[in-house]
């Protein structure tokens, strides 16, 4: 079974560049404090790394 991660948007995207906002939307995050779960594959981990200053990541068991 693949590892899963939980991604929570903790800071607003107001004032951020368009690629950062697009990455947040691609992860499935819309509003502040919204949370989504993803498989921890290289594509998702790369997106999370790009917006690490706006999100909080937890590894799920």
Swiss-Prot record:
Q: Which Gene3D superfamilies match?
A: Ribosomal protein L30, ferredoxin-like fold domain (3.30.1390.20)
- UniProt-listed Pfam families: Ribosomal_L30 (PF00327)
Output the SUPFAM superfamilies linked to this UniProt entry: Ribosomal protein L30p/L7e (SSF55129)
Q: Name one GO molecular function term.
A: structural constituent of ribosome
Give the matching PANTHER family: LARGE RIBOSOMAL SUBUNIT PROTEIN UL30M (PTHR15892:SF2), MITOCHONDRIAL RIBOSOMAL PROTEIN L30 (PTHR15892)
What PROSITE patterns does UniProt report for this protein, alphabetically? RIBOSOMAL_L30
Q: Which family does it belong to?
A: Belongs to the universal ribosomal protein uL30 family.
Reply yes or no: does the keyword Thylakoid apply: no
Per the record, the GO terms for biological process are:
translation
Name of the protein in question: Large ribosomal subunit protein uL30
Output the Gene Ontology cellular-component terms.
Answer: cytosolic large ribosomal subunit
Q: How does it assemble?
A: Part of the 50S ribosomal subunit.
Positions in coiled-coil regions: none
